[in-house]
């Protein structure tokens, strides 16, 4: 009897434990969101625009009580309460009232436009989300699939950007030398897919064939294959993840390398995907490595290390989804030598890029500070364009109690790039000589001023970049108050203003800095806005 009683008690305990475990599992299932919202990982301001273009995710969010973006039936983001009508601007259904933003034009330049409205539209198409609309409208399928599972190749004009499915690349006979972008790297049959290629139309796209302007050289031998690479076992390696191919500009120069990152961001918009669960393959036909001083930035775009094309040498590789990214030096591209209409500034595209990178790299705004303007001076330790009387200028700034002055030298061996970005993003006035370091202006807060102390007669470079970002720009105005060390000594061109060092009149310098401080204090986004001329 005692044994029977013990058995009954043990059975009850087992059933109770089993019930508790089932309840725990059920609660776990109930608590689990129906979509991995964390993977979206976009700035809060961008979420409504993302959901506008991903209605299936918006639908899941609407039905999911645990969706972090849900604040009502048609609203997202408790912080902004933006309607799902919000759109970047390039979408066909996008109405102008719901665009992310629209540029400002202060005047009309003759030869470009007759009125402000036309000037705004031109600038929007040149350098804002209208630029993406133009690229989307150009997309053409050159290699068409016949049945489900076939390959495809779709490109913008001049093959500046392409998308491929079930792409076949044969690197078994790859021959590498010193050329980073060898034009005859592939022979017929070594790159292609099982699809129907319009050869004549495809080869007509080669008008801008150039290493950093087009993918024509790499794709000109694209072949319509008589086999299905994946189905017929022709692949030594199959890459399942979406893969971005990129031809990179100089990785040691911030200005040039950020042309790569900006164009990758634009490419993501074209493909409506900001996932970091992607591969990025550096397209380089040489046997060299690649020096990259800004490698931390890749974390904004991928969870994985950058792959070199040569990693696949001696293999036949098949990519289920491949994207050939927009390139850094395209004619009329962004932002290298881009011809821009004068008088206009403030693209939503470049502001969104800045927000995107800062968010993904966890760079936060720690200010601004009430009663203080944070001034950062970018020093140079290079041979040329040094500020000879830098200490004198800094001491003058420190006599103004409202200015909080910091001098930095962005040496990559001493200061990680993420820390450089943190300093830049927490500056209200950013001062530096002409040079690639001024590309940091992309990551200044909206109210900031960039002061190119002296442009060395290269007037448009950082002025135009500041216009794209929507940051106020000033530079030295009185030539008789800047003092070059000598005439400059270019290695081959002789006298050159970029190849010497400079001293500056302290009084004029202070006048310009105080003008900049006044602009900051009156900016609409400055939380401690003061009356005109307080500085």
Swiss-Prot record:
Renumbered to this chain, motif Required for optimal activity spans 303-305
Write out the GO MF terms: protein O-acetylglucosaminyltransferase activity
Job description of the protein: Catalyzes the transfer of a single N-acetylglucosamine from UDP-GlcNAc to a serine or threonine residue in extracellular proteins resulting in their modification with a beta-linked N-acetylglucosamine (O-GlcNAc). Specifically glycosylates the Thr residue located between the fifth and sixth conserved cysteines of folded EGF-like domains.
Q: Which species expresses this protein natively?
A: Gallus gallus
Q: What is this protein called?
A: EGF domain-specific O-linked N-acetylglucosamine transferase
Q: Which residues form the signal peptide?
A: 1-16
Q: What is its EC number?
A: 2.4.1.255
As recorded in UniProt, coiled-coil segments are: none
Catalytic activity of the protein? L-seryl-[protein] + UDP-N-acetyl-alpha-D-glucosamine = 3-O-(N-acetyl-beta-D-glucosaminyl)-L-seryl-[protein] + UDP + H(+); L-threonyl-[protein] + UDP-N-acetyl-alpha-D-glucosamine = 3-O-(N-acetyl-beta-D-glucosaminyl)-L-threonyl-[protein] + UDP + H(+)
Q: Which UniProt keywords apply?
A: Endoplasmic reticulum, Glycoprotein, Glycosyltransferase, Signal, Transferase
GO biological process terms on file: protein O-GlcNAcylation via threonine; protein O-linked glycosylation
Annotated localization: Endoplasmic reticulum lumen
| GO annotation, cellular component aspect | endoplasmic reticulum lumen
Please give the residues the UniProt entry marks as glycosylated: 22, 271, 362, 501
Family indicated by similarity: Belongs to the glycosyltransferase 61 family.
Which InterPro entries has this protein been placed in? Glyco_transf_61_cat, Glycosyltransferase_61
**Keyword flag Signal:** yes
What the entry lists under PANTHER family is as follows: EGF DOMAIN-SPECIFIC O-LINKED N-ACETYLGLUCOSAMINE TRANSFERASE, GLYCOSYLTRANSFERASE
């Amino acid at each position: 009897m005692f044994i029977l009683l013990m058995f009954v008690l043990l059975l009850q305990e087992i059933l109770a434990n089993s019930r508790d475990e089932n309840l725990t599992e059920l609660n776990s299932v109930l608590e689990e969101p129906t979509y991995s919202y964390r993977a979206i990982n976009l700035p809060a301001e961008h979420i409504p625009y993302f959901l506008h273009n991903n209605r299936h995710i918006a639908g899941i969010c609407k039905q999911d009580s645990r969706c972090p973006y849900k604040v009502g039936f048609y609203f997202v983001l408790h912080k902004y309460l933006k309607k799902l009508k919000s759109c970047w601007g390039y979408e066909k259904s996008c109405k102008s009232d719901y665009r992310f933003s629209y540029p400002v034009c202060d005047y009309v330049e003759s030869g470009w436009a007759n009125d402000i409205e036309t000037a705004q539209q031109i600038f929007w198409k040149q350098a804002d989300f209208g630029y993406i609309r133009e690229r989307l409208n150009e997309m053409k399928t050159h290699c068409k699939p016949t049945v489900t599972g076939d390959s495809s190749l779709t490109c913008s004009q001049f093959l500046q950007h392409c998308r491929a499915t079930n792409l076949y690349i044969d690197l078994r006979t790859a021959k590498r030398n010193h050329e980073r972008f060898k034009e005859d790297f592939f022979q017929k049959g070594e790159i292609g897919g099982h699809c129907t290629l319009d050869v004549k139309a495809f080869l007509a796209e080669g008008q801008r064939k150039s290493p950093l302007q087009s993918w024509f050289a790499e794709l000109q031998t694209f072949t319509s294959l008589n086999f299905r690479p994946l189905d017929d076992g022709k692949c030594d390696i199959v890459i399942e993840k979406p893969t971005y191919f990129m031809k990179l500009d100089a990785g040691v120069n911030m200005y040039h390398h950020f042309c790569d990152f900006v164009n990758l961001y634009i490419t993501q918009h074209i493909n409506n995907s900001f996932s970091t669960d992607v591969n990025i393959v550096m397209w380089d036909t040489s046997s060299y490595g690649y020096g990259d001083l800004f490698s931390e930035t890749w974390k904004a775009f991928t969870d994985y290390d950058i792959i070199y094309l040569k990693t696949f040498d001696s293999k036949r590789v098949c990519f289920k989804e491949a994207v050939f990214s927009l390139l850094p030096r395209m004619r009329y591209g962004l932002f290298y030598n881009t011809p821009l209409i004068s008088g206009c500034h403030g693209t939503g595209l470049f502001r969104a890029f800045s927000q995107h990178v800062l968010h993904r790299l966890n760079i936060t705004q720690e200010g601004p500070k009430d009663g203080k303007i944070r001034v950062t001076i970018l020093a140079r330790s290079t041979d040329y364009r040094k500020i000879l009387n830098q200490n004198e200028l800094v001491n003058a700034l420190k006599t103004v109690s409202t200015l909080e002055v910091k001098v930095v030298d962005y040496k990559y061996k001493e200061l990680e790039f993420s820390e450089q970005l943190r300093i830049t993003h927490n500056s209200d006035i950013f001062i530096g000589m002409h040079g690639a370091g001024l590309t940091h202006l992309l990551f200044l807060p909206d109210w900031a001023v960039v002061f190119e102390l002296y442009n060395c007669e290269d007037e448009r470079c950082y002025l135009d970049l500041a216009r794209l970002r929507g940051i106020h720009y000033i530079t030295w105005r009185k030539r008789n108050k800047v003092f070059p060390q000598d005439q400059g000594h270019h290695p081959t061109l002789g006298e050159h203003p970029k190849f010497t060092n400079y001293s500056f009149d302290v009084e004029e310098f202070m006048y310009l800095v105080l003008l900049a401080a006044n602009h900051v204090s009156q900016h609409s986004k400055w939380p401690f806005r003061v009356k005109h001329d307080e500085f």
